[in-house]
């Protein structure tokens, strides 16, 4: 098993962890549908930058 050569100080440990913070995802509103979506991603309706790029099939609702 690997063993460190010298003890890591709290300062060094903090410097290493400084880039580990999580950031919130960037959200946008589609100009056509008004739907909230992740930036640079297609909306659930199939719109990207105000244009329909994917034809989405209508969801099937089954009744018992």
UniProtKB/Swiss-Prot annotation:
Transmembrane segments: none annotated. SUPFAM superfamilies: Zn-binding ribosomal proteins. It comes from the Bacteria. Keywords: Ribonucleoprotein, Ribosomal protein. The keyword Ribonucleoprotein applies. Signal peptide: none annotated. One of its GO terms (cellular component) is large ribosomal subunit. One of its GO terms (molecular function) is structural constituent of ribosome. Residues 1-23 are annotated as: Disordered. Pfam families: Ribosomal_L32p (PF01783). GO terms for biological process: translation. InterPro entries: Ribosomal_bL32 (IPR002677), Ribosomal_bL32_bact (IPR044957), Ribosomal_zn-bd (IPR011332). PANTHER family: 50S RIBOSOMAL PROTEIN L32, LARGE RIBOSOMAL SUBUNIT PROTEIN BL32. NCBIfam families: rpmF_bact (TIGR01031). HAMAP family: Ribosomal_bL32. Belongs to the bacterial ribosomal protein bL32 family. This is Large ribosomal subunit protein bL32.
């Amino acid at each position: 098993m690997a063993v460190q050569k010298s003890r890591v100080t709290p300062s060094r440990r903090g410097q290493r962890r400084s880039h580990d913070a999580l950031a919130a995802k960037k959200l946008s509103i589609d100009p056509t549908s008004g739907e909230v979506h992740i930036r640079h991603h297609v909306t659930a309706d199939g719109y990207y930058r105000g244009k329909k790029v994917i034809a989405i099939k209508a969801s099937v609702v089954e009744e018992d």
